[in-house]
From Swiss-Prot:
Residues modified as Phosphoserine: S592
Molecular functions per Gene Ontology: signaling adaptor activity
Motif (Nuclear localization signal): 242-249, 643-648
SMART domains assigned to the protein according to its UniProt record, in alphabetical order: BRCT
Protein name (Swiss-Prot/TrEMBL): S-M checkpoint control protein rad4
UniProt organism field: Schizosaccharomyces pombe (strain 972 / ATCC 24843) (Fission yeast)
Repeat among keywords: yes
InterPro entries found in the cross-reference section: BRCT_dom, BRCT_dom_sf
Alphabetically ordered keywords of this record: DNA replication, Nucleus, Phosphoprotein, Repeat
All copies of domain BRCT, residue ranges: 2-92, 96-185, 298-384, 392-486
Sequence intervals crossing the membrane: none
Localization of this protein: Nucleus
GO CC terms, sorted: chromatin; cytosol; DNA replication preinitiation complex; mitotic spindle; mitotic spindle pole body; nucleus; site of double-strand break
Length: 648
């Protein structure tokens, strides 16, 4: 081995490092002589970071210029060199393993011309960032010259950080990603970057205090004193502590509406701000660790100085709403008064029955949306954030089978509930038995969405943008002509409706309507009544595994029989997505036994030849209905004018 305890006097902390790697780093750092802190305390000298979007990183970048931000490879590489007995330089590989300034930053540019554009691109790549020519959802920062253009508009819509170019230069100067709030485009030039980070002068009192703390730390480590004594003498107050208790804000609404509110989609899109604390919650606390909750000073309450009036909520939900709003700084008023800022109603409350309030009216989904995005939205920014339910729309949505694509997070959850109370059925999977594929046109189409659109078009499922639904909700009138919002470009195709899960109602032609009316008024065929059971009654008693929707009436004593089949057509889709397509054929008056026969079951070849022999041997009458039944499989004989039975 090399020098004994090369990291003695170093105090190391981690952020956004997974549990396995964090354990490795803490173990090896301790063997190298460093002190490892789970919490970000004042004596920390090196922060090992896996992402820039964490509280520890942000605090170090802004308020601790003395701290060196390192990559996760530093300790393992240094440890291997140490155990191999290599001579370690005075820098202890620190300079080689600094975390790149723009680590995990994906930068896009807009409204910046040449040659400045090429210069910025080169600096982004040089300092470890990724340059993105096109704006996508995974871009972290948009550097804009002016507050205009499509990229700028979509960046605001997608909650992407929009900054001026000074953000890049100051981040490079600080060797860390600075917070975008100090580099807004609408700031005066003299205020841009003001307060973004502490510029540490070695001669200042603050710099000396940091130096003294580090000396104290080294002296205490050398003297072998306990961490408890060190904390007492060096005043080790935790700056940012790990999270040891449940996070109330993220589950405030899980019981609202008798269902859990899903936040998992958003955690997939954007890394959770405090994800680096999560693994440590399962670790037992050591005796020398301070068991303190995360406490960030001066965190503003979301609903601070806002007063709410709750209208027509059940008592169980009133208590939850009261706790949710009060925990986030809101006030609840028991009576309507001039101090009210918002009236909150249930999302299912009919608009027509709502009194006229002189205050902005929202539903509880507006509160969920604000909590989800951690910002206050205007009541007109989303159609489902204010009263929208109209019972008059329910008959129009009844029978609609809808599948959603391109939606995530709280918007997906709210959209499902809204369509359900409007009378539609929302399915998790796309199949042929769907009326509409509702697409989120506010987002770029993913490959999965494109795949669904392609198959929906092939299956005659209307592909419609979500703006169609927003227009219905805002106007209060159902719009059956979806062409202005159609993505499938099928102008005249009507929307399919379903009476139940397995039967589809198709638009019928005038000819089919007249024929069905005539069938309802007179007996089928030219037979006389008899006591023999009809094939239809026998069919009803068959096993459930026989999937036949064929209407057959035969008279065993009649020379003429009329058969009206419904042929089953199976199209790839969900497990239950079998389309029963009604096909009614008006028979011609036969002068001889009908010879055009086929079978619903393709495996009934043996029975086919048997029946063919009966037909050819007796030309005076069709065999009785009972003889047309396979005793083993219960197969049904049907007739069709457009098929011919051929001897095999």
């Amino acid at each position: 081995m090399g020098s004994s305890k090369p990291l003695k006097g170093f105090v190391i902390c981690c952020t956004s490092i997974d549990l396995k790697q964090r354990t490795e780093i803490s173990t090896k750092a301790t063997k190298l002589g460093a002190a490892y802190r789970s919490d970000f305390t004042k004596d920390v000298t090196h922060l090992i970071a896996g992402d820039f979007d964490t509280p520890k990183y942000k605090f170090a970048a802004k308020s601790r210029p003395d701290i060196k931000i390192m990559s996760s490879e530093w300790i393992p590489v240094l440890y291997e060199s140490w155990v191999q007995g290599e001579d370690l330089d005075d820098g202890l590989l620190v300079d080689k393993h600094f975390l790149p300034t723009l680590f995990k930053c994906r930068v896009c540019l807009t409204n910046i011309g040449q040659p400045e554009r090429s210069r910025i691109e080169n600096y982004v790549l040089k300092h470890g960032g990724t340059f993105c020519p096109d704006l996508t959802r995974d871009v972290t920062h948009l550097i804009a010259g002016t507050s205009s253009g499509r990229k700028y508009e979509y960046a605001l819509k997608w909650k992407i950080n929009v900054v001026c170019v000074e953000w890049l230069w100051q981040s490079i100067q600080r060797n860390a990603v600075l917070e975008p709030q100090y580099f807004q485009l609408d700031m005066p030039a003299e205020k841009i970057g003001l307060g973004a980070y502490v510029r540490l002068d070695p001669n200042t009192t603050e710099a000396k205090s940091y130096s003294e703390n580090q000396k104290i730390s080294k002296n205490k480590e050398k003297s072998g004193q306990s961490l408890a004594a060190l904390a007492e003498e060096a005043d080790l107050e935790p700056v940012i502590m790990k999270r040891g208790k449940k996070r109330d804000r993220s589950i405030l609404w899980e019981e609202l509406n008798n269902g859990k509110f899903e936040f998992s989609s958003r955690s997939e899109e954007n890394s959770v701000l405090l994800d680096d604390f999560t693994p440590e919650t399962v670790q037992p606390l050591e005796e020398n660790e301070l068991d303190t909750e995360l406490n960030i000073e001066n965190e503003a309450k979301l609903f601070k100085n806002l007063t709410f009036y709750l209208y027509e909520f059940p008592n169980t939900k009133v208590s939850r709403l009261h706790k949710c709003l009060s925990d986030n700084g809101g006030q609840i008023s028991e009576f309507l008064s001039s101090t009210i800022d918002f009236v909150v109603i249930p999302h299912y409350f009919p608009v027509d029955e709502l009194p006229i309030f002189s205050f902005p009216t929202v539903n509880e989904w507006w509160i969920e949306r604000c909590l989800y995005y951690k910002k206050i939205f205007g009541i007109d920014e989303h159609a489902l954030a204010k009263p929208f339910f109209r019972p008059s729309l329910v008959p129009y949505f009844n029978g609609l089978s809808i599948h959603l694509t391109g939606f995530k997070g709280e918007e997906l959850s709210h959209l499902k509930k809204a369509l359900t109370i409007l009378g539609a059925v929302v399915h998790e999977f796309l199949g042929v038995q769907r009326s509409i594929l509702l697409v989120n046109t506010n987002e770029p189409f993913s490959m999965k969405t494109r795949f669904k659109i392609q198959h929906a078009t092939e299956w005659n499922v209307r592909v419609v943008g979500v703006a169609w639904l927003w227009n219905i909700i805002q106007s209060g009138k159902f719009i059956d002509q979806v062409s202005p919002w159609a993505i499938d470009k099928k102008e005249n195709q009507e929307i399919k409706k379903f009476t139940n899960q397995n039967n589809m109602v198709f638009p019928t032609s005038d000819r089919d309507t007249r024929l069905q009316n005539s069938l309802a008024q007179q007996p089928i065929g030219h037979s006389t009544p008899h006591n023999s059971p009809s094939l239809l009654s026998v069919k009803k008693r068959q096993n459930n595994h026989i999937r036949s929707n064929t209407l057959i009436q035969l008279n065993s004593n009649s020379k003429d029989s009329t058969i009206f089949p419904r042929r089953s057509v199976t199209v790839p889709g969900d497990k239950i997505d079998t389309v029963w397509k009604s096909s009614v054929t008006k028979p011609e008056t036969p002068t001889s036994p009908q010879e055009h026969v086929s079978y619903i079951d393709p495996d009934a070849q043996r029975e086919k030849h048997k029946l063919y022999a009966q037909l050819t041997s007796n030309v005076d009458a069709i065999p009785p209905a009972n003889d047309l039944q396979n005793q083993e499989n219960g197969l049904l004989l049907i007739t069709e004018s457009h098929r011919k039975l051929r001897r095999r």
